Amino acid sequence: MTQQPQEDFERSVEDAQAWMKVIQEQLQVNDNTKGPRAALEARLRETEKICQLESEGMVKVELVLRAAEALLATCQEGQKPEILARLRDIKSQWEETVTYMTHCHSRIEWVWLHWSEYLLAQDEFYRWFQKMVVALEPPVELQLGLKEKQWQLSHAQVLLHNVDNQAVLLDRLLEEAGSLFSRIGDPSVDEDAQKRMKAEYDAVKARAQRRVDLLAQVAQDHEQYREDVNEFQLWLKAVVEKVHSCLGRNCKLATELRLSTLQDIAKDFPRGEESLKRLEEQAVGVIQNTSPLGAEKISGELEEMRGVLEKLRVLWKEEEGRLRGLLQSRGDCEQQIQQLEAELGDFKKSLQRLAQEGLEPTVKTATEDELVAQWRLFSGTRAALASEEPRVDRLQTQLKKLVTFPDLQSLSDSVVATIQEYQSMKGKNTRLHNATRAELWQRFQRPLNDLQLWKALAQRLLDITASLPDLASIHTFLPQIEAALTESSRLKEQLAMLQLKTDLLGSIFGQERAATLLEQVTSSVRDRDLLHNSLLQRKSKLQSLLVQHKDFGVAFDPLNRKLLDLQARIQAEKGLPRDLPGKQVQLLRLQGLQEEGLDLGTQIEAVRPLAHGNSKHQQKVDQISCDQQALQRSLEDLVDRCQQNVREHCTFSHRLSELQLWITMATQTLESHQGDVRLWDAESQEAGLETLLSEIPEKEVQVSLLQALGQLVMKKSSPEGATMVQEELRKLMESWQALRLLEENMLSLMRNQQLQRTEVDTGKKQVFTNNIPKAGFLINPQDPIPRRQHGANPLEGHDLPEDHPQLLRDFEQWLQAENSKLRRIITMRVATAKDLRTREVKLQELEARIPEGQHLFENLLRLRPARDPSNELEDLRYRWMLYKSKLKDSGHLLTESSPGELTAFQKSRRQKRWSPCSLLQKACRVALPLQLLLLLFLLLLFLLPAGEEERSCALANNFARSFALMLRYNGPPPT
């Protein structure tokens, strides 16, 4: 009688336990908040479906209870405790399963809601961002007059204030993104995404700030021009009244007095002409920033004043003025012709050099590396040709000025022919550059096209092999699947190589197009992985069908041999390659071995059913499976390490090529200007040189970072490869040292030219600066080198080494005064917008005096005695560098606080006081005294040599310079 209830009870218990086990396994699979939003939503839907299955589980538990009641009613008393115990186990398992279902679903749902709220806030921010981009996108509209320009400036300031107000929302968004990233780990909210959002905001803010600065400068120029016009009109009115007083019948003055009066008036004409020329020069800039109607009004006003001045000039020796003007015009034209011929000759030399170096067409059978080298060469030539565009404009302008001069036909033809040659070279370079880039794009697209063909073939194989009728079909399609897997591995290698060329793709095709290509590659890799895994599963299924017709030994021995072969091949790949192609080939081989390891794992699992019932065979299968898994883990480590090595070597090679190209262009430019001093007469040439020289400090930092990266690459290369990298770095440093030597020579030439201009213009008036001591320096507006104030011989003020101690004391006093001002600005509390503006103005004043201080310090270096050990000067150099670093950091940090608030540092500390302290914040607070103690120890280290009398401060100053560089460095840490 009890046999049937017992079987029902056992069956219901097994059904319930199996159902709960399946549910718990599904929950464990979905119990994860990491990953993209689509995956999170999928897990949320899965957990929701699982929660909806609670009623089904309840039914199964009820069946167990009913079966238990029936069994308890018919069983013996000795069996009841066991049945009741099993019932309690079932109930506890059911409660645990229900609790797990609820908690898992709630946790995933909370993270999803948090993410949704963040996306809403992000969308709101980007709507504002797009609105602001649209508002700032149109160019600045030209205005009619000064009042309209001031209104336009006010509107731009309102936009800038709106941008500043959005900083709070951005900070909140970044904080929420960081919190969300710690839970989901999705790249859309990682640190790079936060940096991109911050960078976009900074770009809009910079654009708004540039617009405000531009409009402020435009309004200021127009206002200054209007004041000068009013002053000139008052002078012109006074001169007209004097002239009219000397003319006509009503004039009672004698003839001698009239002539004397007219001669006195004529002496004022040069000053009036100079003032009018200055007004016309100012008007050029003002007209460029004024609407056509306003520009017409300004031009008419200038023409009217010019007409009045010319009428007055007619009264004084017309013929003599005409002859003198003719002679002066002829002399100016001859000088301009000489300058034009000199610049034309230099331009021809530059074109010949560029034509010989960078206009060879690309060979169609060139390799990818050769195409990249050609593209870089064409890019360098393109940049060099673009840098010659201002020179072409100058040649055309000078030729237009000399078009009325006789005997200029040959020079004019030469200029026109040279410009036509330049345009032809520019067009040819553009065609070659575009053709090379198009060829590279086709080369990089080939793996994607091949993958599309392979995907169709793989999908067709999967469809055909879904159900095979006999062993002959399996033997037919299994080699095809293996061939498809081999082709898949080859495609994966090619796509992996594309993913390692991020910097190269960005430099060739632009960041946006390169990002699109890399996204396509990433998507294609995912599709390939899915199909590859499907093919592996299908291959395993077919192999398992074949294995069923074999015994264990026949199936196991090939797997063991394949495992030993993989171990030997992996051991052979643990060496360090020589160069970048070797590392790339090693990476491809390791990825192929990784695919073979995965295939081996599937084959082992296919053999496992043959070992059932034999413990010895099962032990062999377990052992080879463990060995395969260990092998796969070591392969993953090797692949990750090799990918990192390839990525670092690619970055090193790319940056090395860019630096070498820039150094070559800069060296050629400096050598061309150093060889022909006549080009220094053109102010635009000197301005271009100053721009080039200003880029050298930034490139010096890049050279240092490249050396550090090169050391890292050398450690991860073979001895021969390390020698090659070291040789490349040595050549780079040689070319860099040669460039620095050229820079020093060029700076010396520029100073000499400035001194020559100053000596020629001895009539210029010297003015005192308002920010140095009374016994300080006298600054000439046209002379960047400061001089001491003396009343007798000027040479006594700047050429005698005996005055060096006095100059040193004066500079120390000036630097101490500037430091005091900076400290007062830092400690200033901002209560209103006016206070904020005052503080910004004071900081700008300090920054504006930095070039002046640099000139003073260079003067100290120039006048330093030859045998002076310069310990005091080295200490002063360190204090000067430290002041500049502190001023730069203060300009970035202090201006971030809004009116009515403390500074950015004080505000952050006050906010942290009320925020919940996490474990990381507590650790930082505990470590803060230790950090301060470490900084004090570092300060003591480079101050200790100052106490030794016999040693110089060179070591301490070198350390101080490196410490100041660390203070100013804002980029990522060097690798």
From Swiss-Prot:
Gene: Syne3
MF terms (GO), sorted A to Z: actin filament binding; cytoskeleton-nuclear membrane anchor activity
Region feature Disordered, mapped onto this chain: 778-798
Keyword Transmembrane: yes
Membrane topology: Single-pass type IV membrane protein
Organs and tissues of expression: Ubiquitous.
Post-translational modifications reported in the UniProt record: The disulfid bond with SUN1 or SUN2 is required for stability of the respective LINC complex under tensile forces.
Protein name: Nesprin-3
Subcellular location: Nucleus outer membrane; Nucleus envelope; Rough endoplasmic reticulum
Protein source organism: Mus musculus
Biological process (GO), any one: establishment of protein localization to membrane
PROSITE patterns: KASH
Alphabetic keyword roster: Disulfide bond, Endoplasmic reticulum, Membrane, Nucleus, Repeat, Transmembrane, Transmembrane helix
GO cellular component terms listed in the entry, alphabetical order: meiotic nuclear membrane microtubule tethering complex; nuclear envelope; nuclear outer membrane; rough endoplasmic reticulum
Protein role: As a component of the LINC (LInker of Nucleoskeleton and Cytoskeleton) complex involved in the connection between the nuclear lamina and the cytoskeleton. The nucleocytoplasmic interactions established by the LINC complex play an important role in the transmission of mechanical forces across the nuclear envelope and in nuclear movement and positioning. Probable anchoring protein which tethers the nucleus to the cytoskeleton by binding PLEC which can associate with the intermediate filament system.
Subunit structure: Core component of LINC complexes which are composed of inner nuclear membrane SUN domain-containing proteins coupled to outer nuclear membrane KASH domain-containing nesprins. SUN and KASH domain-containing proteins seem to bind each other promiscuously; however, differentially expression of LINC complex constituents can give rise to specific assemblies. Interacts with SUN1 and SUN2; probably forming respective LINC complexes. Interacts with PLEC (via actin-binding domain). Interacts with DST. Interacts with SYNE1.
